[in-house]
């Protein structure tokens, strides 16, 4: 950013958005499931374009300045300025027990409203279908059963990449 920036530009988050997982494939990262899906879509198109270019005789990256100009395009900067700051818990992953009703459900809704994704655990099978959101994974589980609870935690970690709030 420092080598190419002009006055008035807002530095984008420099964290990687996707990575190669040797022997497995690729992993995409984002502050929300929607953001990760957008990264996955761009990554898929980029990989296909590179493969087609290689098949046609070769591919090289753009010079750093050209990549910077694309990333820091005036309209992209305007969009970022309008979007405002991220929600307080954006990028956080929560696990809530008793999430099908009462206090557990209220806590899950509050965490969602603050930007977290929620692994919602309850003995009630309805927890699976309570929310139609990619920020919610409902898991039928009896928290008194250690093996089932360990599997619930693994499900959340596999789906969202970690666990920050219990």
Protein language model features and the residues they cover:
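Conserved glycine-rich Rossmann-like NAD(P)H-binding loop of the short-chain dehydrogenase/reductase
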Residues: 114-130
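A glycine-rich helix->loop->beta "capping" turn
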Residues: 155-166
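A conserved hydrophobic alpha-helix of the Rossmann-fold in NAD(P)-dependent oxidoreductases
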Residues: 128, 149-156
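Conserved small-residue
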Residues: 24, 94-96, 142, 156
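Glycine-rich flexible loops
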Residues: 1-94, 106
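The beta1-alpha1 cofactor-binding region of Rossmann-like NAD(H)/NADP(H)-dependent oxidoreductases
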Residues: 141-151
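Canonical Rossmann dinucleotide-binding motif of NAD(H)/NADP(H)-dependent dehydrogenases/reductases
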Residues: 88-119
């Amino acid at each position: 950013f420092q080598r190419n920036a002009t006055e008035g530009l807002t530095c984008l988050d420099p964290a990687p958005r996707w990575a190669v997982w040797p022997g497995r494939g690729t992993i995409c990262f984002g502050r929300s499931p929607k953001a990760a899906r957008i990264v996955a879509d761009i990554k898929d198109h980029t990989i296909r374009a590179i493969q087609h270019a290689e098949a046609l005789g070769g591919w090289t990256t753009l010079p750093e300045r050209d990549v910077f100009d694309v990333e820091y395009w005036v309209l992209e900067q305007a969009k970022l300025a309008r979007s405002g700051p991220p929600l307080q818990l954006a990028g956080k992953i929560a696990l809530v027990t008793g999430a099908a009703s009462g206090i557990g459900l209220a806590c899950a809704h509050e965490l969602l409203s603050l930007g977290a994704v929620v692994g919602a655990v309850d003995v009630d099978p309805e927890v699976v279908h309570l929310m139609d959101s990619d920020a919610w994974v409902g898991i039928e589980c009896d928290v008194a059963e250690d093996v089932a609870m360990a599997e619930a935690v693994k499900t959340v970690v596999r789906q969202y990449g970690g666990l920050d709030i219990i």
